[in-house]
């Protein structure tokens, strides 16, 4: 009975750099070969048998963890960029609406300042937040009393 060498799947290309000859080695690369021939095949020679290099499980887990964290970081950055662009789109559409309402209030003719009449007073508090300006208009009516 003649032996046919087993061709097994080698470690993934990215993790192949981390393949080592640590024990336990499970995958046999070839039987009845010299130490030099085993090294030429890129395998490990241990106790007369040529084993395939293995990537330790802790390296595989660590690599997967790095990929997951990097993916979460990229997704977070993309989400923040999208949210910021949405906020920038909302600001220009809101600004003309508040400007129109302030113009309408200012163009109304003031009432005569007679006894018991109500005169509107206009307050314009403004606040700046993260580089954009939100303007709001508060109209209050105060009663004037004659003494």
From Swiss-Prot:
It holds the Pfam family TEX29. Residues 125-135 have a biased composition (Basic and acidic residues). Residues 1-57 are extracellular. The chain crosses the membrane at residues 58-78. The keyword Methyltransferase does not apply. Residues 86-147 are annotated as: Disordered. Residues 109-120 have a biased composition (Low complexity). It is found in: Membrane. Its main location: membrane. GO terms for cellular component: membrane. It comes from the Eukaryota. It is a single-pass membrane protein. Keywords: Membrane, Transmembrane, Transmembrane helix. Residues 79-147 are cytoplasmic. Residues 99-108 have a biased composition (Polar residues). InterPro entries: TEX29 (IPR031685). This is Testis-expressed protein 29. It comes from Bos taurus.
């Amino acid at each position: 009975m003649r032996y046919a060498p087993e061709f097994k799947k080698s470690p993934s290309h990215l993790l192949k750099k981390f393949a080592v000859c640590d024990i336990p080695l499970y995958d046999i690369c070839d039987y009845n070969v010299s130490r030099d021939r085993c090294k030429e095949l890129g395998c490990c020679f241990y106790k007369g048998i040529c084993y395939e290099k293995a990537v330790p499980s802790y390296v595989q887990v660590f690599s997967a963890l790095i990929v997951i964290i990097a993916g979460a970081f990229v997704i977070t950055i993309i989400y923040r960029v999208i949210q910021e662009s949405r906020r920038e789109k909302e600001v220009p559409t809101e600004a003309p609406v508040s400007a129109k309402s302030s113009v309408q209030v200012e163009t109304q003719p003031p009432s005569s300042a007679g006894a018991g009449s109500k005169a509107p007073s206009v307050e314009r508090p403004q606040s700046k937040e993260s580089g954009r300006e939100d303007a709001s208009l508060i109209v209050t009516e105060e009663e004037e009393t004659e003494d």
